[in-house]
Amino acid sequence: MSSFFTNKVVAITGGSEGIGKALIDALIPLGAKIATCGRSFDKLYNLQMQYTNVMLHTVVTDVSKEEDCRKFIQSTLDTFGHIDILINNAGVSMRALFEDADTDVFRKVMDVNFFGSVYCTKYALPSLISRQGVIVGISSVAGYRGLPGRSAYSASKFALQGWLEAIRTELLEKQVHVMWVSPGFTASNIRVAALDANAQSQGASTMDETAMMSAAECADHILRAIEKRKRSAVLTLNDKRTVLVNRLFPSWADKLTHNFFFKGGKLVK
């Protein structure tokens, strides 16, 4: 990778683990200055201890709270003076049939996945405009094709992509690059922490994490997509097929998706 990220100030939400942590691990050797946030003080402290001699700024933040997002962005600006790239990575998933799920599941998922991105982008936007910077949303194939058992998650990703497309158009003349990335199934904690029907962490993954793309590989794809100024990037071949089939043959896509997630009438994935 070129010197594109050298001395760039990159703000990443949800950087204490998973894809966010992998992005930090990849960006630090490239000479980027990084600000990140997460809900866990301990995880952020461990991250800070891992990188004691680099430009890494961490802030305990719950992105579902607008004031927390404002403080994270302001703290980043106070520390580095500006923001070149904002990666809205923080996210939460869910696993429950709609008929069983409490409506609080929808509120919590939307608050993190959609409104967290809106809040951080809103407060970072003046700096991003002045720097002709980059806004990135970490989305999912669920932003193209609604997934059973993930209705709230799918809704949040459809909302994210629609909003990003709208502001991309608004910001065209201001030279701010807006994009989203759909990683596909990536080995991380997101399925363990996914909300159940009662809006509580389900505590275990229902899928084989070892067969998935690694967070490090995902981060590499994301950074290359940013450098190439892509409008969007779907990272796995399977997800590219899903998007294409859903666009061209939606009824067939319904059946294929149902058969993947259900066995014997029960949600198994």
Language-model features, listed with the residues they occupy:
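SDR active-site lid
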Residues: E173-L237
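Conserved glycine-rich Rossmann-like NAD(P)H-binding loop of the short-chain dehydrogenase/reductase
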Residues: L30-L47
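Residue(s) in the substrate-gating loop at a strand-loop-helix junction
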Residues: S140
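The beta1-alpha1 cofactor-binding region of Rossmann-like NAD(H)/NADP(H)-dependent oxidoreductases
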Residues: V60-K71, T103
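Substrate-binding pocket helix/loop in short-chain dehydrogenase/reductase
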Residues: L97-F98, D102-R107
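Active-site helix of classical SDR
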Residues: T121, S156
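Conserved glycine-rich cofactor-binding loop
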Residues: V9, S16-E17
